[in-house]
Amino acid sequence: MFNLNQTKKASLPIKMRIRKGDTVQVINGKEKGKTGEVLKTLPIENRVIVQGINLRTRHVKPTQEGESGRIVTEEASLHASNVMVYSTKQKTASRVEVFIDKDGSKKRRLKKTGELID
């Protein structure tokens, strides 16, 4: 027999090449073509939250007496496969390549343009 109330086994975080602060472009879905800054990454779920993209309205109940309820608009997460890092200089989206620099440190660069991200 199996238990229907079993929770999903916690998975390990995925190594993401997108980081907080990166400018990304949405490549799939209803927000396709829009760009924004990554506010937060969720590596266990392989998702990102992008500023001004995938907005959802949420109704918030009052928490204290005398306070009224309100409607809050906030960003919902997107799957990381639906965004690409965007170069503001070249105005193009590209995949990210991780390479080891001459001094032995790991760096990220755009595959299409060769531009260093950090």
Swiss-Prot record:
Keywords (A to Z) from UniProt: Ribonucleoprotein, Ribosomal protein, RNA-binding, rRNA-binding
Domain of life, source organism: Bacteria
GO cellular component terms, semicolon-separated: ribonucleoprotein complex; ribosome
Biological process annotations from GO: translation
Keyword RNA-binding among record annotations: yes
Keyword field contains Ribosomal protein: yes
GO MF terms, alphabetically ordered: rRNA binding; structural constituent of ribosome
Pfam families the record matches: KOW (PF00467), ribosomal_L24 (PF17136)
Physiological role: One of two assembly initiator proteins, it binds directly to the 5'-end of the 23S rRNA, where it nucleates assembly of the 50S subunit.
PANTHER family per record: MITOCHONDRIAL RIBOSOMAL PROTEIN L24
Subunit structure: Part of the 50S ribosomal subunit.
Family: Belongs to the universal ribosomal protein uL24 family.
Protein name (Swiss-Prot/TrEMBL): Large ribosomal subunit protein uL24
Gene (name only): rplX
